[in-house]
Each structure stands twice: as structure tokens, then as C-alpha cells.
Amino acid sequence: MTEESADFEIVNELANATDRNCLVTVTNVIFDTTGKLVGEAVSQTTVMAHSTTQVQNTGTIAAPDLWSPQYPYLYTVKTYLSYQKAYQVHEMKVGIRTYRFHSDKGFILNGVPAILKGVCLHHDAGCLGAAVPYEVWTRRLIKLKKTESKMSMRKKF
């Protein structure tokens, strides 16, 4: 990945629960936050009856906006599965970034050293118990990021 382009790889897992083989077209399209198409990849494969298979689509995004805690840019990936005249659409948000851990420089995010400030949280939510609702974790993490500039978390147990 460079400032000029970022290669992407999307692995699509397909399941065929029918009694016949299906020729499926898998289309992955990537949109920026304005809705502009910035990447696309298409492939076809036969999914055997009562089996699963993986389809790998690859492509390139020109001049990518990189995700970081300070600039959490998210692209929208839409996956279209089509078989004969029927189709299914799946949508998700993704960020583009590089990261690595270096023995001398520490954590490197998008080529820049970053300090991981974090907390250790118990697995439960007090009176709510151990089955903590998603909303509680969301509220906790937003509060930690805003008030204490934390960007990492370790859970106990």
C-alpha cells in the first residue's frame, strides 16, 4: 500500500444448501463516503451441491483515505451474489490501514509510530452480569476514547 494506491483482497465464503450445483457470480464493489465507486472485482464460480467454497476477489483503490483513530475513514463494501435471476446483497464498513509491531519502534500504524494507551477491563458489567450487551461495551469504549484518549483494551477472563 502506498499513498497512490491500495490493493484489496476480499474472500467471500459461499454455501450451497441445494441439491444441485450453482454457477454464482460474486461482485464486490467499494464506495467512498460520498458514494463514489472506488473499487470493483467480479468473479464466477460453481458451488457444488451441499458444500461451501471460497471466492477471492482482488483489486486496487487509487489514492486511498487511510483509517486511523484520529481519522476513522470507512469505506462501504457491497457484495452481490447472483444465481440465475436471483441475487443477494451484503454490506459492511471497512477501513484501510497498515499496522505492524517493531521490536525497537513499537506499534506502527500507517507507517507512523503510535503509542498504545489502554486499559484492562473485567469481563462483566457489574449489576448487568457477564452477558454484557453490545451497547454497554460501545458506551464504555466511546467514553474511554473521549475522556482518556485510550485506543486499546484487554479483557480479563
Regions found by a protein language model. Name each.
Residues 1-156:
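Secreted/periplasmic carbohydrate-active enzymes, especially glycoside hydrolases
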